[in-house]
């Protein structure tokens, strides 16, 4: 079973929390909220997305890169895929 499927409830809860934070940010911008409140909302959204990424990344590494039955070629392919995602995320 995939780690994202196994952790689906937790991941969806995180995504819904992010959605709520993004909606709060949108409301703050629409209502002309104070800069400090808007910045705090942006930081909250960023932190929540980083937490989601960390949770999925940890599951991916544990399930795919640490798999005892993976061939060296499969492991190298998994590393390359992961590095592509990380490079994109860090831009």
Curated annotation (Swiss-Prot):
Which cysteines pair up through disulfides? They are: none
**Positions in coiled-coil regions:** none
Keyword set for this entry? Cytoplasm
Q: Name one GO cellular component term.
A: cytoplasm
Q: Which family does it belong to?
A: Belongs to the FrmR/RcnR family.
Name the GO terms of the biological process aspect: negative regulation of DNA-templated transcription
Q: What is this protein called?
A: Uncharacterized protein in bioA 5'region
Principal location class: cytoplasm
Subcellular localization(s) per the UniProt record: Cytoplasm
What is the organism field in this record?
Serratia marcescens
A GO molecular function annotation here is: metal ion binding
Write down the Pfam families for this protein, in alphabetical order. Answer: Trns_repr_metal
Q: InterPro entries in the record, alphabetically?
A: Metal_Tscrpt_repr (IPR003735), Metal_Tscrpt_repr_sf (IPR038390)
